Amino acid sequence: MSATQAGYWYLASYPKSGNTWCRVFITELQRLAAESEPQELNLNRDLETGAIASSRHWLDDQMGVNSCDLSFAELDPLRGRAGESAWLFAEGERFHKVHDAFKSPDSRGRPVVSTAGCRGVVYIMRHPEDVVVSLSHFFSWPLERCVDYLLDPTAALVPGERNGGHQVRQHMGRWDQHVRSWADQSELPVLVMRYEDMLAKGAETFMALATFLGLPTEQGLVAQALANTSIDRLKKLEEQVGGFVEKPEGCERFFRSGRTGEGAEQLSLEQRKQLAKGLADVMERFDYGGVELG
């Protein structure tokens, strides 16, 4: 099968929901299937599943523009064109990370990612209470600010207008809006994976992932890839390379506890009520419990 026939996929998520874990698993499964004697995974060398959809260099290369010269209203409607060239289908770089919502307020009703040749999207989601705690450690923000962030309809990564950094603005909106933007869109096939199931039902959940993506589904391979990329193993691999390159400055480590339920332990009752009230419909839809609202 040619690279173009193989197509490509998106791995979409709200930040700190398990996207990197998913990418590492895909990398390891492919390595185990391809190498007779695979070497131990090096996080800073081997994790090359594809581009992040918000990469400024990648977008500029694909669209032939300087995105620093464009406003959000000018850039977002164009972003869906990126990837229409054959480069996106390069062998070995077929799984592209996305933190944007599927559409933005500035994209004029169009997706901010290319859908031409895309075979589907894996949407990874996590209990919003636990996302708050993980974001707090990742951004070095107080919990209160992270609660407000998940409830902010204008929330974005790299929010500055005409910012010249490595990534462009990624509109996410409220946590529930982000989930619905991907789970309910009808332009691409979608597999929704809950972080909680990745932990509690790993064999079943990652086998479903491999099947959806057309990756090797031999039970022994999937089990070995899962064992090699457990959260505890990833923490050790991060230590071995002296820190994961995707860890922001000021963050002690990228792979932290990986547990579920930290939000319920660390958030105040009022903060949990804020999330439950604001995100109730989507939390209930995906079986995420919260505090009772009296």
Segment roles from a protein language model:
Residues 216, 228, 281-285:
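Hydrophobic alpha-helical segments
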Residues 18-32, 192-217, 225, 233-234:
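PAPS/PAP-binding and catalytic site of the sulfotransferase fold
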Residues 219-227, 287-294:
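Short, flexible loop/turn segments with low-complexity composition
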Residues 226-277:
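PAPS-dependent sulfotransferase catalytic core
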Residues 174-177, 204, 250:
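Generic alpha-helical secondary structure signal
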Residues 101, 127, 196, 228-231:
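Short, solvent-exposed coil/turn elements at secondary-structure transition points
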Residues 1-192, 256-294:
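PAPS-dependent sulfotransferase catalytic domain
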Residues 217-220, 268:
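Structural helix-adjacent loops and short alpha-helical linkers that scaffold large soluble proteins
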